């Protein structure tokens, strides 16, 4: 498919998840409605990952596309209908007999993802070493956490030009080259094994806490096979604490088999969240999730959340923006050359600020213009003028004077306060 056709195919999938309730805003949100170019809901401004959107197939397609043309093709399967690669997510179902008064019932636990290992006991042990609130048990808080991290750590618009907004043919080509490069140089999937199993597979080096990587003992040298020794000769690359050989460890091939991590320590070095499904990016001796690896390589637009492949973009408030996306967060009007106010790290034009965000003066009960001086005490504000910041009893101007605040009112003296009580 040529670049022109790829550009024409682009769209953000506005029908996807339409009307889904927001898990954060509850009834305050009318239901999910994707903004035209921002990756947020038009109604409540929360991201799609905050809404109860059924995305299992879409997420499997996204991860499948990520693994396409990599060494991890064993983790994907192409649908016969359209040839789209689908992620072969490993689902683990555990059955535990539960004793009852008359008979034995079966308690079934389904993990929406589990490490693809042949030894189910090892996978089970891996899960038990994760914080309970992050174990992806179907219908649990952990499953919701995994879903949210899939959206956050591996945004589709970081790998698929068709998920981006109005890229030029040149930008499409540059993005495809960028994706090809990180697939060949940084992308990896963690491998769960017992540390002792790697002796024959990886380099004969181990990480010693407080020391250098050691070389194997000479032929004929005596080795201490005691359990105490084996519990201290391996240490986690992240927390530096020793590991027991009987506990599962995660290896990252791109990092080298002399490094290993506790399951709960296999996290992004920037956001410190568990690397979802053990998908990692390796750079400068550090683990990254997909999002933060891309952030280390390319500027990201604070408006649309996409990587910037254009030669021209703007920087404002310590953030990067496509020229066309430096807009008011409320009304989408272009802010270049206009007065704006930052509200929760989002730029808002002056009219929208006055209408939606400005504090109200306790004196005149009008919104306070962002360019006008004001007096603030606790959660109350006044215009810093002789007409507004007055004693609530005698109307004496209190600018530069001592005052007594009482539930939104201010007094110049105890006498005035008593008269109003």
From Swiss-Prot:
Its main location: cytoplasm. Residues 155-164 have a biased composition (Basic and acidic residues). Residues 92-199 form the PET domain. GO terms for molecular function: zinc ion binding. The keyword Transport does not apply. Residues 133-164 are annotated as: Disordered. Keywords: Cell junction, Cytoplasm, LIM domain, Metal-binding, Repeat, Zinc. It is found in: Cytoplasm; Cell junction, Focal adhesion. One of its GO terms (cellular component) is focal adhesion. Pfam families: LIM, PET. InterPro entries: LIM1_Testin, LIM2_Testin, LIM3_Testin, PET_domain, PET_testin, Pk/Esn/Tes, Znf_LIM. It comes from the Eukaryota. PROSITE patterns: LIM_DOMAIN_1, LIM_DOMAIN_2, PET. GO terms for biological process: negative regulation of cell population proliferation. Residues 234-297, 299-359, 362-421 form the LIM zinc-binding domain. CDD domains: LIM1_Testin, LIM2_Testin, LIM3_Testin, PET_testin. The keyword Repeat applies. Interacts via LIM domain 1 with ZYX. Interacts (via LIM domain 3) with ENAH and VASP. Interacts with ALKBH4, talin, actin, alpha-actinin, GRIP1 and PXN. Interacts (via LIM domain 2) with ACTL7A (via N-terminus). Heterodimer with ACTL7A; the heterodimer interacts with ENAH to form a heterotrimer. Belongs to the prickle / espinas / testin family. PANTHER family: LIM DOMAIN-CONTAINING PROTEIN, TESTIN. Scaffold protein that may play a role in cell adhesion, cell spreading and in the reorganization of the actin cytoskeleton. Plays a role in the regulation of cell proliferation. May act as a tumor suppressor. The N-terminal and the C-terminal halves of the protein can associate with each other, thereby hindering interactions with ZYX. This is Testin.
């Amino acid at each position: 498919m040529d670049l022109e056709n790829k550009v024409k195919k682009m769209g953000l999938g506005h029908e996807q998840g339409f009307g889904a309730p927001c898990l954060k805003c509850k009834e305050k949100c009318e239901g999910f409605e994707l903004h035209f170019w921002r990756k947020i809901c038009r109604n409540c401004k929360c991201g799609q990952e905050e809404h109860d959107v059924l995305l299992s197939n879409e997420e499997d397609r996204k991860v499948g596309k990520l693994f396409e043309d990599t060494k991890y093709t064993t983790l994907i399967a192409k649908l016969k209908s359209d040839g789209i690669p689908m992620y072969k997510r490993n689902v683990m179902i555990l059955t535990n007999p539960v004793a009852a008064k008359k008979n034995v019932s079966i308690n079934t636990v389904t993990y929406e993802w589990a490490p693809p290992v042949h030894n189910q006991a090892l996978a089970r042990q891996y899960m038990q070493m994760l914080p309970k609130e992050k174990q992806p048990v179907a219908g649990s808080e952990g499953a919701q956490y995994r879903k949210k991290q899939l959206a956050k750590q591996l945004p589709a618009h970081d790998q698929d030009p068709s998920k981006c907004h109005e890229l030029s043919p040149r930008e499409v080509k540059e993005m495809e080259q960028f994706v090809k490069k990180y697939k060949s140089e940084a992308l990896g999937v963690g491998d769960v094994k017992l540390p002792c199993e790697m002796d024959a597979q990886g380099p004969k080096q181990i990480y010693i806490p407080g020391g250098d990587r050691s070389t194997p003992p000479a032929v004929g040298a005596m080795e201490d096979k005691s359990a105490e020794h084996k519990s201290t000769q391996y240490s986690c690359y992240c927390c530096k604490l020793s590991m027991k050989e009987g506990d599962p460890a995660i290896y990252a091939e791109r990092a080298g088999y002399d490094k290993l991590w506790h399951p709960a320590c296999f996290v992004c070095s920037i956001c410190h969240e568990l690397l979802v499904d053990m998908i990692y990016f390796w750079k400068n001796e550090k683990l990254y999730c997909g999002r933060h690896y891309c952030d280390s390589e390319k500027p990201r637009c604070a408006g649309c959340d996409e990587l910037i492949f254009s030669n021209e973009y703007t920087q404002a408030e310590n953030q990067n923006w496509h020229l066309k996306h430096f807009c008011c967060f409320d009304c989408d009007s272009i802010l270049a050359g206009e007065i704006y106010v930052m509200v929760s790290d989002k730029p808002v034009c002056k009219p929208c600020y006055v209408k939606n965000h400005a504090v109200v003066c306790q004196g005149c009960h009008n919104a306070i213009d962002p360019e006008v001086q004001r007096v603030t005490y606790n959660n109350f504000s006044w215009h810093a003028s002789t007409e507004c910041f007055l004693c609530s009893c005698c109307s004496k101007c209190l600018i530069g004077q001592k005052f007594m605040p009482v539930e939104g009112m201010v007094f110049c003296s105890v006498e005035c306060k008593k008269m109003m009580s």
